[in-house]
Regions:
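Glycine/proline-enriched, intrinsically flexible loops and inter-domain linkers
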Residues: 1-262
Length: 262
């Protein structure tokens, strides 16, 4: 989504991924643990709260490749680093795992800069509904695992929907391939969801957002959860009102849910 949000729209091409964990201490197919390699015996084996390093490396890699293939952005390269070290009484390790997801894309010179919001521009959200997903994801991912309760940490986990991202991308691509791109500005929904994305769209001038127009998948969400959840595969756009009907027609063609929210 970051690459879709370059300038006033751009094209993702390929994905990359870097995985960083503590030593995985791999198990055999029958579930037994083989003898530790010399470097794996530096620190004692820890009890892991959610997943072992081995499980993370397998599942994260499978997930990144699966999402990229379904979205149409193949994962073409990456890196893996496992690390544990003890220096005197200090212990260091990637117990707090890191996955760096990146990629390659391109955009045109015409569309490389965002436009300036004007009175009358419409704030548009494209993509999926709001759910109790990814609440505080940006904050929880920045502190030690286990600092918060299990409920808070598990609610902070983001879930992926590659089909919805493909629909949103098809709309964005169609707009940037036109002779006159109707997009004034575009941002992806990342950390803090609507609160972050829609604020960035109107940060230079301010704007009005009608929360009743935001799509709700879970009717039990509070107002805070609606504006701050990180349900994935959503883009925020500023569109000049005169182009709105045209953009709606393309969204309908691509089956990309589109909502005018401000």
């Amino acid at each position: 989504r970051d690459r879709m949000g370059g300038g006033v729209g751009s094209w993702p091409i390929a994905g990359t991924a870097v995985y960083m964990t503590a030593y995985p201490r791999l198990t055999e197919d029958d579930g037994t643990t083989p003898a530790l390699r010399d470097w794996e015996d530096i620190l004692p084996v820890r009890q892991w709260l959610y997943q072992t390093p081995e499980q993370i490396l397998i599942k994260a890699s499978n997930g990144a490749s699966d999402f990229g293939n379904k979205f149409g952005q193949p994962l073409i390269t990456g890196s893996l680093l496992t690390f544990e070290h003890q220096e005197n009484s200090e212990k260091y390790a990637y117990d707090k795992v890191i996955m760096l997801a990146g990629g390659v894309g391109y955009g045109t010179k015409r569309d490389c800069l965002k436009g300036e919001p004007q009175a009358g521009n419409k704030v548009v959200v494209v993509g999926g509904d709001n759910y109790r997903i990814g609440l505080g994801g940006g904050s929880v991912s920045s502190v030690d695992t286990g600092r918060y309760s299990n409920g808070i940490e598990l609610n902070a986990i983001q879930r992926a929907n590659p089909e919805m991202q493909k629909r949103a991308y098809n709309l964005v691509r169609a707009l940037v391939e036109e002779d006159n791109n109707p997009v004034v500005s575009i941002h992806d929904h990342g950390s803090a969801g609507h609160l972050n994305c829609l604020s960035e769209l109107v940060e230079e001038c301010g704007g009005k957002i009608d929360m009743t127009q935001l799509p709700i998948g879970d009717k039990t969400l509070s107002a805070k959860e609606i504006i701050a959840n990180e349900s994935q595969e959503r883009m925020g756009l500023l569109i000049d009102e005169k182009h709105l009907d045209h953009v709606k027609k393309i969204a309908e063609r691509e089956r990309a849910p589109m909502y005018v929210v401000g």
